[in-house]
Regions:
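Short secondary-structure transition hinges
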Residues: 108-150
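Amphipathic alpha-helical packing segments from all-alpha helical-bundle domains
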Residues: 80-83, 132-159, 168-173, 199
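N-terminal intrinsically disordered/low-complexity leader segments
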Residues: 1-23
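Helix-turn-helix
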Residues: 27, 35-69, 73
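Generic hydrophobic, amphipathic alpha-helix propensity
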Residues: 21-32, 49, 74-82, 86, ...
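Hydrophobic alpha-helical connector segments
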Residues: 73, 77, 87-114, 171-174, ...
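Amphipathic C-terminal alpha-helical segment
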Residues: 109-113, 151, 155, 174-192, ...
Length: 212
């Protein structure tokens, strides 16, 4: 080996470069959530995020074209976490009926559980404004969140527990009903008692799929 070459800096490995890129993006997302929680939607500025993260403008544009792209990434992260939780709670339930009830309860938690309501409220009031710009991304997020419900309804049909001619359509109806009232309550601060919402939502679900 040429001694002259041995002292030269070696090219950074692809893995290390990828890890550094991921770390930088994670720092931006963490800082963005901190700024959003502190300043709210209307006080959210890219400059504040960069100060919080200790990163440059160049760092921002390596990952995002504009502020709304960063907000979308935050929303995808939050909804991705929600989807994981929904799958976990439904998987832990014993019967299809239990799975659907667990799914509904976990969704409503986002408007009433103290550790979940803050991020839920930040996005609940503005996701409709972002929807026209990012319809495909929203469709993917909804499909991921809705998947455990679709599976539970299909399982209930297969064992004769539910009656549904179109489990996916029924899952869509149930999802948007529950997610809609949850988003409203997250925005309003949970002014309507949870039990009252359950009395409205559950009879509809029972009629729609034969929930026991």
């Amino acid at each position: 080996m040429d001694p002259a070459n041995s002292s030269r800096p070696q090219p950074e490995s692809t893995t290390t470069a990828a890890e550094r890129t991921d770390n930088e993006r994670s720092r931006l997302l963490r800082a963005a959530m901190d700024v959003l929680q502190r300043n709210g939607w209307w006080g959210f500025k890219v400059e504040s995020v960069l100060r919080q993260a200790g990163l440059s403008t160049r760092s921002f544009y390596r990952h995002f074209d504009k502020k709304s792209d960063l907000l979308l990434a935050l929303l995808e992260y939050e909804l991705g976490g929600a989807a994981v939780n929904l799958r976990r709670v439904t998987a832990a339930a014993a019967t299809p009926s239990d799975k659907v009830r667990a799914y509904v309860a976990a969704t409503m938690d986002m408007a009433y559980r103290e550790d979940l309501v803050k991020p839920s409220s930040l996005f609940a009031s503005h996701w409709r404004e972002m929807l026209p710009e990012y319809p495909d991304a929203f469709d993917r997020c909804v499909a991921e969140m809705m998947a455990p419900l679709v599976e539970a309804i299909r399982e209930g049909i297969a064992n004769g527990e539910f009656t549904s001619e179109d489990p996916e359509a029924d899952a869509v109806a149930v999802f948007y009903l529950v997610a809609g009232v949850t988003a409203d309550q997250a925005t309003l601060g949970g002014v309507t008692p949870r039990e009252q919402l359950e009395h409205v939502v559950m009879p509809f679900i029972q009629r729609a799929i034969g929930l026991r």
